[in-house]
UniProtKB/Swiss-Prot annotation:
Residues passing through the membrane, by range: 31-51, 53-73, 107-127
InterPro entries given in the database record: TMEM88
Swiss-Prot/TrEMBL keywords: Membrane, Transmembrane, Transmembrane helix
Protein name: Transmembrane protein 278
GO cellular component, one term: membrane
Length: 173
């Protein structure tokens, strides 16, 4: 394509076949190697921060899940075995179930498994809190939340040193 044809296409506003599809980069006055360390440290900081957040999320999610699974698995297995061997659930239980358990024994297993779940949930919660307390230095800090604001104290409260008992809130657990 000649120079004259290019000029006429540019004047008309029509794109030519040989025109570049993407805009060209502007020439920079600064050298890119000067900015590379700055960009690398910013990118690395973002990567480390998001990595810590992901590890913290997984620890706070997987730790309770693992503890509760390990503690509650025996009770769930007992309930499953009770349902597996009961004749109303399976019309023809296997020969092992018939040899080991009657329908009354299967019902007893189901009841025992379900009644053992609440104490095991409490035990799992205690084990989780113990693990969190021991792993606190390794776990990332939770997100910062603003401190609750206290209402301004009146001059009467300051003179007594204690707020009125009616205004004071106590919660017993």
């Amino acid at each position: 394509m000649s120079e004259q044809e290019r000029e006429t296409e540019e004047d008309e506003g029509v794109a030519s076949d040989t025109a570049p599809m993407l805009p060209r980069r502007r020439p920079t006055d600064y050298h890119i190697s000067v900015l590379a360390p700055i960009l690398a440290t910013r990118g690395l900081g973002t990567l480390v921060l998001s990595g810590r957040a992901l590890v913290g999320f997984l620890l706070h999610l997987l730790l309770p899940g693992t503890v509760f699974l390990l503690v509650l698995l025996p009770a769930a297995a007992v309930v499953y075995l009770g349902f597996l061997c009961h004749s109303r659930v399976h019309p023809a239980p296997g020969p092992r179930c018939r040899a080991l358990l009657s329908d009354r024994g299967s019902a007893a297993l189901i009841v025992f498994g379900l009644l053992s779940l609440p104490p095991l949930v409490v035990l799992a919660a205690a084990a989780r809190s113990l693990l969190v307390r021991r792993l606190r230095p390794a776990l990332p800090d939770p997100a910062r939340t603003p401190a609750p604001r206290r209402p301004p104290r009146s001059s009467g409260d300051l003179a007594d040193g204690h707020p009125d008992e009616d205004k004071q809130l106590c919660a017993w657990v």
